[in-house]
Amino acid sequence: QPSPVPVGATVMVWIYGGGFMSGTASLDVYDGRYIAATQGVIVASMNYRTGAMGFLSLGNSEAPGNAGLMDQNLALTWIKENVASFGGDQSKVSIFGESAGAASVSYHLLSPMSKNLFQRAIMESASALSPWALLPDAEAHRRGVELAKAVGCSTDSDIEETIECMRGVPALTISENEWVVWGLCQFPFAPVVDGNFIREHPTVSLQTGNLKQTDVMVGFNNDEGVYFLLYGAPGFSKDTQSLITRDQYLEGIKMSVMGINDISVDALSFQYIDWVNFDQPSMYRDAIDNLSGDYNFICPALSFGKAMASFMGRKTYQYKFVHQASNFPWPKWTGVM
């Protein structure tokens, strides 16, 4: 909080990212003192369960999914009830988050359980429309069963017995076996339409206006795809210039867009190749960066923002971040991640 302690200050609540698989509010990069000191606002955050601990969904009341989002909801409830004691105004709360945190922010806009807990929202690099931000029920159930098998719990018996077995498994064992499914820009556990916190598919809510209609800001960075490409795409490494070949480019498309067929690979390849600068050594690298970033982060953010902008009487803002800091720890070619 600012010093001296204000009265009726705006409140900003941060929700960290991490693919719904990891993260913590205590990272130095999330230190809210700088915003509080320079802008005179109250900055709050919370930890929430991630991975299987936060998003295991087996389709019953014992493992319904979205526990991590419910953690966030509980924190928002506490903040609304208590922030006045810290100099904040409960009627001036803005929630903001990055990546999975941005997707979380959009889910709070969509959920009737959260809509009265804040006033405005900022989504940085993603939304609930991101392909990794929502799992179909059947796929979420399959992944939960695979995890149960991996930690030695039988899935042949009643599902309640399986869950009871998993409760006896050490947390470290659970976390060590969570990556039962892997794909570039894909995460094993994520939110589901549970009929409680998330009551319908996000696209339905956006089409019907069945969500909190308020002022929002959406944005993204210039090179959203690079960070994930460095963790598994063919030919990518932070220790090289990652000047990939055409074959590696095509393979990267298949990894970035899961389940894509060959015709779609060819279409995307043609669309993203820079035909004007075709002879540039970095051309294929930059093309897959743009494709992966568009598919996983930029287009979902813009689509969500466009839908919000269609509601009368509300303001929607958009930004694109293109500045690379002088102390940026990654190679210069990685751009603005």
Curated annotation (Swiss-Prot):
The active site is at 99 (acyl-ester intermediate), 224 (charge relay system). PROSITE patterns: CARBOXYLESTERASE_B_1. One of its GO terms (biological process) is choline metabolic process. Its EC number is 3.1.1.8. It comes from the Eukaryota. It is an enzyme of class 3 (hydrolase). Transmembrane segments: none annotated. It catalyses: an acylcholine + H2O = a carboxylate + choline + H(+). Glycans are attached at residue 290. Disulfide bonds join 153-165. GO terms for molecular function: acetylcholinesterase activity. GO terms for cellular component: extracellular space; plasma membrane. Keywords: Disulfide bond, Glycoprotein, Hydrolase, Serine esterase. It holds the Pfam family COesterase. Belongs to the type-B carboxylesterase/lipase family. This is Cholinesterase 2. It comes from Branchiostoma lanceolatum (Common lancelet). The lineage of its organism: Eukaryota, Metazoa, Chordata, Cephalochordata, Leptocardii.
